[in-house]
Design a protein with these regions (language model features):
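Secondary-structure junction motif
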Residues: 174-177, 181-230, 295-297, 313-317
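A short LG(V/I)-centered, amphipathic sequence patch enriched
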Residues: 39-58
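Alpha-helical linker/hinge and terminal dimerization helices associated
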Residues: 5, 41-42, 63-85, 313
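Acidic, Gly/Pro-rich loop/turn segments at junctions of secondary structure
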Residues: 115, 127-207, 264-267, 279-281
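Short helix-boundary/capping micro-motifs
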Residues: 9-30
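A late-sequence structural motif
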Residues: 170, 264, 271-316
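Central regulatory/effector-binding core of bacterial HTH transcription factors
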Residues: 89-152, 240
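Hydrophobic hinge/microswitch elements
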Residues: 127-131, 136-139, 146, 216-271
C-alpha cells in the first residue's frame, strides 16, 4: 500500500510516467502496470491519459487527498515518537511576516533556545496569504495573525498585542506645535499605553501625503477603515508591501504612515508619533496551528513563551 501511494504521488508530481519512473528508479512499464492494478482494484482510472500532460481524474483527486492525509498522519506519528524518546529536543517550523520574524520572534526564540538548546528551529518568511496556505497544507507548525476573518479557520492561542501609531515626518506635521505628539523615546517607554495618553483624530492629517501598505495586508485593511471613520480619502504618495520599508520611507520624509509600536527600537527626531482615536489601533495576534495536527512538545514550548497573550516586546513599565 505504501509503495503504490508513493508511485501514484510521484506520477502526480511529474505529470509523466517516464520521468516518475526515473525518479523512482524503476522501469516505466513496471510503474504503469503497478498503477493499472490499483485502478483495476478501484474500478476507475486515477489518471486521465488522454490529456497532455496527464492529469488526475475525480477518483485521482480523491486518492491524492487520501495520500496526503496518510503522509501527514505518518509525520505526526513520527513526531509523537520523537517527543517520547527525546523530551528535551524537537523541531518546529514557524511561519511569519518580515515584521514578525525580525521584531517579535528573536526575543522569544532566544529565550526558548536558552532553556531548550537542542530544539531545532526552521523560520519561514512569506506573505500572510501564503502562510495561511502553508498552514492549511500542514507545512508549518505555527504562524501568527490578527484578522478575525482569518484566525477563525484555525486552532489558536493568544500570543501578543501591538498598537498601531501614526508616524508623521516632523517637517510636514500639522500638529507639531500642539504638544500632543509622542517622541520615539516616549513610545519606547510605553507612554502611548497609558490611559492618560492623548488621542488625536486622524482627520487632523487629511492634507498631508500618506505611505500605505498594499491590499491584503492587515494594516492596509485597518487603515482603510480608519480613513472611513475619519471621513476622508488619503492623499496616497506610495503603496508597498513591507511595514518596515514604509517606516523607513516615512523617516526619510516622504509621507506619514501607520506603524506598529514594536518597530520603534531606537531614538530618532525625524518622526512624531500619534495615538489615533480609534478602537482599530489595538491588534491582538494569535498563534495559529494547523487543523487536525498533533502539536509537538517543541511547538507547545514555543507557544508557552507568549504566556497569556499580553506579551509585549520591549515594554516593561
Amino acid at each position: 500500500m505504501q509503495q503504490e501511494m508513493e508511485y501514484i504521488y510521484e506520477v502526480y508530481k511529474e505529470k509523466n510516467f517516464t520521468r516518475a519512473a526515473e525518479k523512482l528508479f524503476i522501469t516505466q512499464p513496471a510503474l504503469s502496470m503497478a498503477i493499472q492494478k490499483v485502478e483495476e482494484r478501484l474500478g476507475m482510472p486515477i489518471f486521465d491519459r488522454s490529456t497532455r500532460p496527464i492529469s488526475l481524474t475525480d477518483a485521482g483527486y480523491a486518492y491524492l487527498d487520501y495520500i496526503e492525509s496518510a503522509r501527514h498522519l505518518d509525520a505526526e506519528f513520527e513526531q509523537q515518537i520523537q517527543d517520547i524518546k527525546e523530551l528535551d529536543k524537537g523541531r518546529i517550523v514557524i511561519g511569519g511576516s518580515h515584521y514578525l520574524n525580525a521584531y517579535i520572534l528573536p526575543e522569544v526564540l532566544a529565550e526558548l533556545l536558552e532553556k531548550y538548546p537542542n530544539v531545532q528551529i526552521e523560520l519561514k518568511e512569506a506573505s500572510s496569504a501564503e502562510l495561511a496556505e502553508r498552514l492549511r497544507k500542514q507545512e508549518l507548525d505555527v504562524t501568527f495573525h490578527c484578522s478575525p476573518e482569518f484566525i477563525q479557520d484555525f486552532p489558536r492561542y493568544p500570543a501578543f498585542r501591538d498598537t498601531v501609531l501614526l508616524a508623521v515626518p516632523v517637517r510636514m506635521d500639522p500638529l507639531a506645535d500642539q504638544s500632543v505628539a509622542l517622541s520615539s523615546e516616549q513610545v519606547m517607554e510605553g507612554r502611548h499605553l497609558q490611559k492618560d495618553c492623548p488621542c488625536v483624530s486622524l482627520k487632523e492629517f487629511s492634507e498631508i501625503p500618506f505611505i500605505l501598505l498594499s491590499k491584503g495586508n492587515n494594516l492596509y485593511e485597518r487603515s482603510v477603515r480608519m480613513f472611513d471613520e475619519a471621513g476622508f480619502e488619503p492623499k496616497t504618495k506610495m503603496k508597498l508591501s513591507q511595514l518596515v520599508t514604509a517606516y523607513h520611507l516615512a523617516a526619510a520624509g516622504i509621507g506619514a504612515t501607520f506603524v506598529s509600536d514594536l518597530l520603534i527600537r531606537s531614538p530618532g527626531r525625524e518622526l512624531n508619533y500619534y495615538k489615533i482615536d480609534s478602537e482599530l489601533v489595538t491588534r491582538q495576534f494569535y498563534a495559529l496551528l494547523p487543523k487536525r495536527k498533533y502539536v509537538s512538545v517543541a511547538a507547545r514550548r514555543f507557544i508557552s513563551r507568549f504566556g497569556d497573550g499580553s506579551f509585549h516586546v520591549g515594554f516593561h513599565a
